């Protein structure tokens, strides 16, 4: 039986979610998308993401994939998914047919993160739930010096859980910008 592997690129506002991964309590991004996919495709499937996000974390382009035993029309399912997910703050940016060996997590070549800090006294309006609000004055020169120390290859063993499945604790931080 031939299997078809489909990649989704996903954007979401994570404020009202427990994170990416399905959990016993709370609503997850993975769970919401998987529910709509199963309803539309009428098959049991598992949506696998490129990584897990914590509660309240947003994504601009997270990769996920699922494998099924029949072809689908990506444009049609894209419209359907977005119709049912838009009210939840989830958008599917694209769906692509991939090779059998593609895996969202293990095929990823890099991950990009954006942390937004707004440094002012006034409360956040437009960036509420989308930025870290720091009222105390920040020392940007010191922050830039610290960022330079973090750039490069480092061993992150101290930050891993004992059940971490990653092959290596070594990671390379290519670029950190403080603006």
Labelled PLM ranges:
Residues 1-179:
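Structured-RNA-binding interfaces characteristic of tRNA pseudouridine synthases
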């Amino acid at each position: 039986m031939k299997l078809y592997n489909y990649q989704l690129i996903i954007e979401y506002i994570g404020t009202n979610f427990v994170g990416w991964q399905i959990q016993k309590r709370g609503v997850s991004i993975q769970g919401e998308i998987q529910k709509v996919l199963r309803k539309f495709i009428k098959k049991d499937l598992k949506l696998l993401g490129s990584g897990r996000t914590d509660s309240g974390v947003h994504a601009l382009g997270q990769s996920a994939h699922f494998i099924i035993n029949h072809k689908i029309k990506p444009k049609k399912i894209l419209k359907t998914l977005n119709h049912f997910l838009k009210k939840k703050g989830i958008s599917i940016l694209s769906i692509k047919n991939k090779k059998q060996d593609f895996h969202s997590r293990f095929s990823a070549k890099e991950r990009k993160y954006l942390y937004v800090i707004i440094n002012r006294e006034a409360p956040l309006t437009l960036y509420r739930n989308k930025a870290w609000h720091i009222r105390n004055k920040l020392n940007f020169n010191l922050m830039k010096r610290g960022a330079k120390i973090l750039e490069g290859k480092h061993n992150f063993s101290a930050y891993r859980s004992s059940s971490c499945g990653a092959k290596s604790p070594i990671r390379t931080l290519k670029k950190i910008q403080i603006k």
